[in-house]
């Protein structure tokens, strides 16, 4: 359950699969004028190049700004009739202005976290790696499509 999404090639089948990478889904949602559940959308090569560029810019900016530990509620509930919260120090990126502009976390039902943390960067890293491979090995007449289900 949650956000699953992918990029599909007309020649190679599924070339990227994401799980709860809501910032990437939000990017496609914005670029494609809205994305409906279980609907396939054509994606232009130029759009994939723009996504790659945005991912690289955000990654470089996050790394340049560094990380800092922030207190975050990791668990809450009722115990012995009293409300409680468990808090932990969690490393998060400090300079997130560009990330908020280009690849902001996108809310949705079970879409994953909204923090600018190591998981956020890992999803961007994986997207960069896959897009570089896809774009460098593009085949003649190959078309790409994006779909998501949640």
Residue ranges, per PLM feature:
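Acidic (Asp/Glu-rich) sequence patches and key acidic residues
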Residues: 1-150
């Amino acid at each position: 359950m949650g956000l699953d999404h992918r990029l599909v090639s007309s020649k190679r089948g599924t070339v990227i699969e994401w799980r709860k990478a809501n910032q990437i889904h939000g990017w496609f949602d914005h670029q494609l004028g809205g994305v409906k559940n279980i609907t396939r959308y054509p994606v232009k090569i130029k759009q994939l190049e723009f996504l790659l560029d945005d991912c690289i810019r955000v990654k470089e900016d996050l790394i340049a700004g560094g990380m800092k530990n922030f207190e975050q509620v990791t668990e809450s509930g009722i115990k012995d009739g009293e409300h409680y919260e468990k808090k932990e120090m969690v490393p998060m990126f400090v300079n997130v202005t560009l990330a908020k502009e280009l690849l902001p976390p996108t809310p949705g039902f079970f879409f994953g976290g909204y923090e600018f943390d190591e998981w956020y960067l890992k999803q961007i890293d994986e997207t960069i790696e896959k897009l570089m491979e896809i774009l460098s090995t593009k085949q003649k007449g190959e078309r790409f499509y994006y779909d998501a289900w949640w």
